[in-house]
Design a protein with these regions (language model features):
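Active-site cofactor/substrate anionic-group-binding motifs, chiefly glycine-
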Residues: 1
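ATP-dependent carboxylate-amine ligase
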Residues: 7-180
Length: 180
């Protein structure tokens, strides 16, 4: 459970453990594919991947927890659409954009059919460092690859059908099986 891991990491930090030691200890924890996986990459980017499922509650909890992390580099959020939201999809994605835009992410990427609703929320939060589209387009891939640098922390969350794991694959993961 990511909330328990975050609580343990916070407690470790509060009692004086160095952030790098905490991160390395968390990296040794293993979970089910797509559920709060800590992934190391060839280019020294740290990734938290949660691409198995997404709903408003899980997005809210994880985004708020990740936003409190102290990292060496920049914090990058990759958000995939929450699927199966029915008639509330527009409203929920706008609220999600507002939440993400109010956190301290250096850059945000969003993919999914509700990208305009998500963008409306980002704009309400007066957030400007983002790229949104219906899918991982060649231009988004290029921007992402040129943006992410060693020591950056990339947080990836979305519904399974959006295939957000493609962003993980772009970073040349070391301890990863992209096959679901």
């Amino acid at each position: 459970n990511i909330v328990n891991l975050m609580a343990a990491a916070t407690l470790a930090y509060a009692v004086g453990m160095q952030p790098e030691k905490i991160w390395h200890a968390l990296a040794k924890c293993h979970s089910t594919w797509g559920r709060n996986q800590f992934i190391k990459t060839k280019n020294q980017v740290d990734i938290l991947f949660d691409g198995y499922n997404a709903n408003p509650d899980s997005m809210n909890a994880l985004i708020k927890n990740v936003s409190t992390l102290e990292v060496q580099g920049r914090k990058v959020a990759v958000i995939g659409q929450m699927r199966e939201m029915g008639s509330k999809a527009q409203e929920l994605h706008e609220e999600l954009g507002l939440l993400v835009g109010s956190q301290k992410f250096d850059q945000v990427f969003f993919i999914g059919e509700n990208f305009k609703d998500f963008e409306a929320g980002l704009k309400k939060a007066h957030y400007q460092n983002y790229l949104v589209d219906t899918d991982l387009t060649p231009s988004m891939k290029e921007v992402f690859l040129n943006y992410v640098k060693p020591q950056d922390f990339v947080f990836i969350k979305g519904s399974r059908g959006i295939k957000t794991e493609r962003f993980v694959d772009l970073c040349e993961p070391l301890n990863w099986n992209s096959k679901y």
